[in-house]
């Protein structure tokens, strides 16, 4: 049993358990901090049931688009059912550690609540960097601090007990290694927000 099994097993009850008024309010305040612009093309990695999608659509407007992927078949099914009415949202099965989108496809790539569950984080970041446009942004975010998240995963299931965010120095090193610049990390109770940019070609 692994993280994928955990998410497949919990997909049908995920929103009831985790999509609380607090989380909705948190996302309403968090997503505007991503720096997204109307009309942009955004990749939502590890979308789950799509908790981020309504907030992304609000920021991007009708001219923007969201491609949402998840490695859990059951999560994708839940997400497709919830958001089938949105014309500018595409939901599909995908793993960013393996998925190779075309070069310079997206203005921003968002990883909300997923980064600790990536087994090969360096490969995932390389793929994200490749598919980002020049000056594109990577956002890694959680509704808990890295320390709170570690304890949360240890508590909820043995399948995700070892899934955690690298320490700040390690995260910065990993991002620089995969070509990211302008790295900022906020890690405080109730919020983790990492924003980085793709190297600007001169």
What are these regions (language model features)?
Residues 1-36, 51-55, 75-78, 82, 139-162, ...:
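Conserved class I S-adenosyl-L-methionine
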Residues 122-134:
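A short glycine-rich, Lys/Arg-flanked "PGG" loop and its adjoining helix->strand segment in the class I
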Residues 179-181, 186-202:
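Core SAM-dependent methyltransferase catalytic element
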